[in-house]
Amino acid sequence: MTFYQELQLNQAGSKNLLKKSKTLKEKLYHMWVYLVKIAATMAFCFFFVSIFSILFGNENSIVGVVVLLCLMVFRNADLGIHTGQSTMLLALFFVIMTVCPHLANQFSPVLGMLLNIAALAVLILFGCHNPSMFNQSTLVLGYLLLYGYDVTGKSYQMRLVGMALGAALTCFVFYRNHKNRTYKRNLKDLIQEFDITSSRTKWQICQILCVPIVLCIAELCNMPRAMWAGIAAMSVILPSMEDMHYRVRKRIVGNIAGVICFTVLYFLLPSSIYAYIGILGGIGVGFSAQYGWQAVFNTFGALAIAAETYGLQGAVSLRVSQNVFGVVFALAFCVIFYWFMPKKKESEVTVHAE
């Protein structure tokens, strides 16, 4: 394996190489490559998002985050169908992520929920056909981030331009990387494979319904940062109930641990570098191969931003309450939903929770 190929490995792959190292020299080499990868990734992410902030305004830095997520995921991941059709779907997904979250914010919570259901139905049914690829962690997360950080007026006009640029970049990279691959299925096959008795379709419907309902309830209860509850719900909804239970436990424990760690750092560090706690969390995520640890470090970035608006106590209370509500509601919703949905004997779609 070349140096460049090793840089392309995910956290689990890099850690597996470290574990299998037979000599200290080999282990030190793999550790060095791993550290270079983390540093290069962080530097690139910081540079990329900063460019979007400069071009389209600080209030649209979240656009840089969403575009970056899509670029990093879809340079490797696919939609399981013909490359040309997949590219057109990606362009459609960007239109949906640009328009629907903004419109939903203009409506009442209930009407917004209905629009969110319709938007997520397209994203999930056509973009998340293979649960093992976790495309929902990109598409639905991107949608929720844009929903939570909505803008108006001139800022929204700049967001339109930023998302158009992001769509062009993502579609270009996706098509270039996948054009030589052969796919036997097309868009029509995705529609024909919709089956409410299959574990995949039930999982998709759960995502489509549960996440907008969580957002709606949080907003009706006047809970700030409703997107946190939606993101928490999205992240734990899986085809396997066993995996769901695992993620619910890890999400709750991870967020509480993250809150404690953030609070300690908040009091130990000078106020001038509070913003860098989020970057520290990003580095931690880079070293984390397991969901539980990712939940811990993801908390840093969210709290670093929220603490500026709500103060430390308010941000911590919101983070814990929104996450516990989101994952517990999602688990209860899916248990009831799966219970009432028709069943058939089939080979279950398996998605590991790690």
Region roles according to the model:
Residues 83-92, 131-142, 249-257, 297, ...:
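Cytoplasmic-side transmembrane-helix entry/capping segments in multi-pass membrane proteins
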Residues 1-90:
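N-terminal signal-anchor module of multipass membrane proteins
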Residues 42-50, 54, 90-102, 116-125, ...:
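Transmembrane alpha-helical segments of multi-pass membrane transport proteins and ion-pumping complexes
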Residues 51-59, 84, 97-111, 153-162, ...:
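Membrane-helix interface and helix-disruption motif detector
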Residues 212-265, 269:
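Transmembrane helical segments that form the transport core of multi-pass membrane transport proteins
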Residues 1-35, 178-201, 342-354:
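Intrinsically disordered, low-complexity non-transmembrane regions of multi-pass membrane transporters
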Residues 42-47, 59-77, 114-152, 167, ...:
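Pore- and pathway-forming membrane helices of multi-pass small-molecule/ion transporters and channels
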Residues 101-192, 196:
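Membrane-interface helix-loop-helix junctions at boundaries between adjacent transmembrane segments
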